[in-house]
Curated annotation (Swiss-Prot):
The keyword Metal-binding does not apply. This is Adenylate kinase. Coiled coil: none annotated. PANTHER family: NUCLEOTIDE KINASE (PTHR23359). InterPro entries: Adenyl_kin_sub, Adenylat/UMP-CMP_kin, Adenylat_kinase_CS, P-loop_NTPase. GO terms for molecular function: adenylate kinase activity; ATP binding; nucleoside diphosphate kinase activity. It comes from Fusobacterium nucleatum subsp. nucleatum (strain ATCC 25586 / DSM 15643 / BCRC 10681 / CIP 101130 / JCM 8532 / KCTC 2640 / LMG 13131 / VPI 4355). Residues 129-161 are annotated as: LID. Disulfide bonds: none annotated. The gene is adk. Pathway: Purine metabolism; AMP biosynthesis via salvage pathway; AMP from ADP: step 1/1.
Length: 211
């Protein structure tokens, strides 16, 4: 079996995190998210972590060169030898090129790019329908998983689950991601999957691709 060096793409609410967990559980490879890498580096007070902390404490975005350095360090770790899933990176073509350079130095390359395709209208319905109970903390969906024992006044919508915010996030995702997918399509690495199917069917589609 080839090394499972994967990039997983999907808009917010496409089910990317859920599918990544299934891949991790089945193949025993780590899920690599830039957010997690940053948190660990800051907690461990590494050189790059301390640099990143200055920007995070100031409420600023951590510059690409620091993030790229942290990604390079993470991919060189032993648990990535048999593969990994990149989650939330690369977000743009510049980062995709840097990722290729990092992997080339490690004698690796991205083997497969999986894109979960879900129409925007479905994403909006999935996210804007989410409600959280102020009492129990449980998360519901007004259509797909409606609450039975909760009072309506106890259910709240998160600020970033409003339609206005979701539409903006989708615009950003499409503007950034379309060129990255094109970058990998030229390399013949992209497989697109229908993300509107049943959860288990999507998982099986992914497993068939990975072998």
């Amino acid at each position: 079996m080839i090394n499972l060096n994967l990039v997983l793409f999907g808009a917010p609410g496409a089910g990317k995190g859920t599918q990544a967990k299934f891949i991790v559980d089945k193949y025993g490879i780590p899920q690599i998210s830039t957010g997690d890498i940053l948190r660990v580096a800051v907690a461990n007070k590494t050189k790059l972590g301390l640099e990143a902390k200055k920007f995070m404490d100031a409420g600023q975005l951590v510059p690409d060169e620091i993030v790229n350095g942290l990604v390079a360090e993470r991919l060189a770790e032993k648990d990535c030898e048999k593969g990994f899933i990149m989650d939330g990176f690369p977000r743009n073509v510049a980062q995709a090129k840097v990722l290729d350079e990092i992997l080339t130095k490690l004698g690796k390359q991205i083997e497969k790019v999986i894109a979960l395709n879900v129409p925007d209208k479905d994403i909006i319905e999935r996210i804007t329908g989410r409600r959280t109970s102020k009492v129990t903390g449980k998360i519901y969906h007004i259509k797909f998983n409606p609450p039975v024992d909760e009072k309506p006044e106890d259910l709240v919508q998160r600020a970033d689950d409003t339609e206005e915010v979701v539409v903006k996030r989708l615009e950003t995702y499409h503007n950034q991601t379309a060129p990255v997918l094109d970058y990998y399509k030229v390399q013949n690495k992209v497989t697109e999957i229908d993300g509107t199917k049943k959860l288990e069917d999507i998982t099986q589609d992914i497993f068939k691709i990975l072998g």
